[in-house]
């Protein structure tokens, strides 16, 4: 018996769907009437089919944030569509970005000894939930070398100390350029990036902190939480800035704990939360659902 097609409509329509390219448009600008109509009208005139829209108007700053996903007739390309949208962007003073949804974002993952968040990211990529290309794994330890080898991903072990930190960060800069990485993910990488590197990679580095920020910043947050007798522990995925654990928050989650649990129980519970929160944050970033709004983020989940 022949398998049934997922779509049973007219053959011509199926051909049309196959020959359309998907793009994602994100922009922010001073809010005023007519912006959405202007953008969607230009896309409609080009024959685009808008499949998803999200928008948020920040009343405090008077800024509009918007994300649109759309199909455009082939052979469409970024340069052509950017040129079509340029007059609208200029008219409304937009900060605009257009992305080809077929191009997988390239990610470098950095990890120290605890590999639970790394393993979950690799799994989510393998099963197709996280659509990205992991182009390298960097660590200051050798612990995850076998994991990288099994996954067929280049592994770089660069131990870090006060004397060689600048040299090792220069290696990272070179690797990002060589591998054409779009994003760096700190999956429990226990080294603090320098202020200069944090600024250079602004909006391109996501960290998972093992506490529900802004509570318990810095080292050993589970021990801090245990000492305070909290009833909830959590994890926070945020963009990295020069201020430690102060970057714009992308995603958070909590888990309930009780008085009869040990610090080790807190840590074990937290590992699952960290892995889930980081994976969700990375997914939202690579799908261009996160827009930085000062010290905050707009997340079109």
Each PLM stretch: what is its role?
Residues 132-143:
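Short internal beta-strands
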Residues 1-20:
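N-terminal amphipathic/basic-hydrophobic helices that include classical n-h-c signal peptides
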Residues 107-117:
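Short, glycine-rich nucleotide/cofactor-binding loops
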Residues 141, 164, 168, 182-301:
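Donor/substrate-binding cores of folate-linked one-carbon enzymes
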Residues 149, 153-179:
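Adenosine-nucleotide cofactor-binding segment
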Residues 19-105:
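A conserved regulatory-domain signal marking ACT and ACT-like small-molecule sensing domains
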Residues 116-126:
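Histidine-anchored nucleotide/phosphate-binding helix
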Residues 28, 108-110, 138:
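Short hydrophobic segments within beta-strands
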């Amino acid at each position: 018996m022949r398998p049934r097609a997922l779509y049973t409509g007219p053959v011509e329509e199926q051909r049309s769907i196959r020959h359309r390219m998907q793009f994602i448009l994100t922009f922010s600008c001073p809010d005023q009437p007519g912006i959405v109509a202007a953008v969607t009208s230009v896309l409609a005139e080009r024959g685009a089919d808008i499949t998803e829209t999200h928008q948020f108007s920040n009343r405090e700053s008077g800024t509009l944030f918007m994300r649109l996903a759309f199909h455009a007739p082939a052979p469409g390309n970024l340069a052509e569509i950017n040129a079509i949208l340029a007059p609208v962007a200029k008219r409304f003073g937009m900060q605009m970005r257009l992305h080809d949804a077929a191009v997988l974002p390239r990610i470098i993952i950095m990890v120290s000894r605890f590999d639970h968040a790394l393993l979950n990211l690799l799994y989510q990529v393998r099963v197709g939930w996280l659509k990205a290309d992991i182009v390298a794994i960097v660590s200051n330890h050798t612990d995850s070398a076998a994991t990288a080898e099994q996954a067929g991903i280049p592994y770089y072990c660069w131990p870090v100390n006060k004397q060689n930190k600048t040299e090792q960060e220069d290696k990272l800069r070179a690797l990002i350029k060589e591998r054409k990485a779009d994003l760096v993910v700190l999956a429990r990488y226990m080294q603090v990036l320098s202020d200069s590197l944090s600024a250079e990679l602004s909006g391109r580095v996501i960290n998972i902190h093992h506490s529900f920020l802004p509570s318990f910043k810095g080292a050993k947050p589970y021990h801090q939480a245990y000492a305070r007798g909290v009833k909830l522990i959590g994890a926070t995925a945020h963009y990295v800035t020069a201020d430690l654990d102060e970057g714009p928050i992308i995603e958070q989650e909590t888990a309930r704990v009780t008085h009869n649990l040990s610090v080790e129980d807190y840590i074990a519970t937290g590992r699952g939360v960290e892995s889930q929160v980081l994976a969700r944050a990375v997914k939202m970033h690579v799908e261009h659902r996160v827009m930085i709004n000062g010290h905050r983020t707009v997340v079109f989940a």
